[in-house]
Amino acid sequence: TNLSGMGHRVESELVANVIAVQVAADQQVAVGDELVLLESMKMEIPVLSERSGRVAEVKVAPGDVVQEGEVLAVIGD
């Protein structure tokens, strides 16, 4: 989701456990870079960046349980 002036919100597509966070705030990312690794029903699901930019904010940490639609990170320009 892109909110004008706020960056691109990377959201979880399902209820899952956060296994790993692969990026940090202020880190530069490219399209296809792995941002977060989720686990649901014994399957690992990598969350990839859909745009290039700088990580403005990471909203989750390993061990967190996220809901569908929950914001994982925000990517700025």
Q: Where does each model-flagged region fall?
A:
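Short histidine-centered loop motifs in beta-beta connectors
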Residues: 13, 20-24, 28, 57-60
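Short, well-structured beta-strand-loop connectors
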Residues: 24-35, 62-72
